[in-house]
From Swiss-Prot:
Name of the coding gene: bioB
PANTHER family on file: BIOTIN SYNTHASE, BIOTIN SYNTHASE, MITOCHONDRIAL
Family designation: Belongs to the radical SAM superfamily. Biotin synthase family.
Co-factor(s): [4Fe-4S] cluster; [2Fe-2S] cluster
Protein name: Biotin synthase
PROSITE patterns for the chain: RADICAL_SAM
Catalytic activity: (4R,5S)-dethiobiotin + (sulfur carrier)-SH + 2 reduced [2Fe-2S]-[ferredoxin] + 2 S-adenosyl-L-methionine = (sulfur carrier)-H + biotin + 2 5'-deoxyadenosine + 2 L-methionine + 2 oxidized [2Fe-2S]-[ferredoxin]
Quaternary context: Homodimer.
Length: 339
């Protein structure tokens, strides 16, 4: 190959990663989004292989431990009491029911068990049951994650003392677009909860939702916010909007799936050591697009038939896709029929 030919196949001269002292400016993130698709994928795969096994994917299962009746008005959410989605509010599950679900998740190959409650914030009366759930799930040999809304300092510490591994609290979108989706909780409220989680010594799981009508620059704004958290999240879930009937975002035009893949790739480049997770809306991606996401640097996914109140690809389909791609679960034998 001649020198000119070699130069022609090299990606454009945009930094693969920001130096430790440099913040990811929105303009820099936009520049990544605007790379030719093949160049962006090449870059993301380079970064991914520097830090992870390129053919291993971590499996998580998500259980709604308290469904519906949430006080918040998040425009995408079927669990908001502000929206008429036909979802009936339920009480907090009892501990034994949660542990039974965790056992089933482990038997199906999950290595992390995530518990979600539709609350603005947990009440003190809920904390004993929540901490018991954490301890019980950890005793089963699973990593634990919870998403319960905003936390006070003492609540974060109680969860940490129980051994909680991760706390999920998404930023959802960029600061500029946020007000078009949510009015009952501020962006700063979310950042404050993340600070409390960090201060308690719990790993942070924080990502967002794309396809809510935001622009590419606003998607870049979300990634910039996440990448500039100090430190950036250990776990970054990327959700593809599920436009649920009865919510304000019902009827939102679907996002171009290549834009979703680009978002995964940009997240990988800007947060090289984070676990990047395919989350809600994965069923809207065909097998080829999911394979593209793994190539772009996604190395975790929610595994199971339901995510809170939205469906998820069936486990058998996931097993078949992994086999076709030569991907294995990061937990040994996690996809075997007898796992």
């Amino acid at each position: 190959m001649t020198q000119a030919q070699t130069a022609a196949v090299q990606p454009a001269a945009i930094p693969v990663a920001a130096p430790a002292s440099q913040r990811w400016r929105v303009a820099d993130v936009v520049a990544l989004f605007e790379l030719p698709f093949n160049d962006l994928m090449f870059r993301a795969q380079q970064v991914h292989r520097e830090h992870f096994d390129a053919n291993a994917v971590q499996l998580s299962t998500l259980l709604s431990i308290k469904t519906g009746g949430c006080e918040e008005d998040c425009g995408y959410c079927s669990q908001s009491s502000h929206h008429d989605t036909g979802l009936k509010a339920e009480k907090l599950m009892d501990v034994d029911t949660v542990l039974d679900a965790a056992r089933a998740a482990k038997a199906n190959g999950a290595s992390r068990f995530c518990m979600g409650a539709a609350w603005r914030n947990p009440k003190e009366r809920h904390m004993p049951a929540l901490t018991e759930m954490v301890r019980g799930v950890k005793e089963l040999g699973l990593e634990t994650c919870m998403t319960l809304g905003m936390l006070e300092d003492e609540q974060a510490q109680q969860l940490a003392d129980a051994g909680l591994d991760y706390y999920n609290h998404n930023l959802d979108t960029s600061p500029e677009f946020y007000g078009q989706v949510i009015s009952t909780r501020t962006y700063q409220d979310r950042l404050d909860t993340l600070d409390r989680v960090r201060d308690a010594g719990i790993n942070v799981c924080c990502g967002g939702i794309i396809g809510m009508g935001e622009s590419r620059r606003e998607r870049a704004g979300l990634i910039s916010q996440l990448a500039n958290l100090n430190p950036y999240p250990e776990s970054v879930p990327i959700n593809n909007l599920v436009a649920i009937e009865g919510t304000p975002l019902e009827g939102t035009a679907p996002l171009d799936p290549f834009e979703f893949v680009r978002t995964i790739a940009v997240a990988r480049i800007t947060m090289p050591k984070a676990v990047v997770r395919l989350s809600a809306g994965r069923e809207q991606l065909d097998d080829a697009m999911q394979a593209m996401c793994f190539l772009a640097g996604a190395n975790s996914m929610f595994y199971g038939d339901q995510l809170l109140t939205t469906s998820n690809p069936q486990t058998q389909r996931d097993r078949a896709l992994f086999e076709r791609l030569g991907i294995r679960a990061s937990q040994a034998d996690a996809l075997s029929d007898n796992a």
